[in-house]
């Protein structure tokens, strides 16, 4: 910590020489990321005029709130938040895995504790995270406008704004559920041992939830006017069906492994199902890349997602 203290002191001396003024008059922030927060928590002192930019845990949960001592800081406090994660142990880049209630909860915790001078959001490639970006921008504009029991209202308004009134209720439900299911287990972190294939029909129940959701998304999509088709595919249909496919790949692979160990010929049925789902994923991604909006968003959904990092 002594070395780090010398580094900050040296930086402030350089700022003072270059700008010809007291460093306390020059806006500065100190990013309290994962590898740095342990020093701060052990008592490392940061000049009072420097903003403290606290970071979440890389998976959308803030690490701390601002106690009263920090709320009085001249430099204030900010938050660095991830809706996209590129790094170990796993990425979270391919598709939205964050629910609106979770976002509202986490940003409200920050806001109510004085972490409100600056919010920086890691949004990755933008396209996969359009929904959480929209919510965060609206919430940042007026945190008091969206209460804890109004997140469903926000989703309906979002759906109505993008697709009209007729199907807003159905679409908001689809979006809420796929992001909730993805939050159970993010696609890039799926594995064959997450949901049990032997206890309480857990794997079967999860498979049924995803299949039902995908069927509903198809049904609503057939009712979409032509003008909304592309938007519906990229904001609703692809996230729902592609997420459902990845989830079922691992659920089917889990049964394949179990049944193979048991010497059951039905293990082959689940092996074929995995192959079918890979084909569906390839076809959907190709459509997104080459057909949707004339290929405007090519490669946006080509991130690795159906092969486990483990």
Language-model features: locations:
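Gly/Pro-rich turn-and-neighbor structural signature
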Residues: 1-74, 203-232
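Short secondary-structure boundary/capping segments
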Residues: 1-3, 44-49, 67-70, 94-101, ...
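Flexible loop/turn segments at secondary-structure boundaries
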Residues: 35-40, 59-62, 69, 85-90, ...
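Conserved, mostly hydrophobic/aromatic
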Residues: 52, 110, 122, 158, ...
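Active-site clefts of carbohydrate-active enzymes
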Residues: 74-98
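Catalytic-core region of carbohydrate-active enzymes that cleave or remodel glycosidic bonds
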Residues: 94-121, 135-143, 269-286
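Extended substrate-binding grooves/exosites of carbohydrate-active enzymes
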Residues: 123-169
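C-terminal non-catalytic alpha-helical accessory regions
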Residues: 153-308
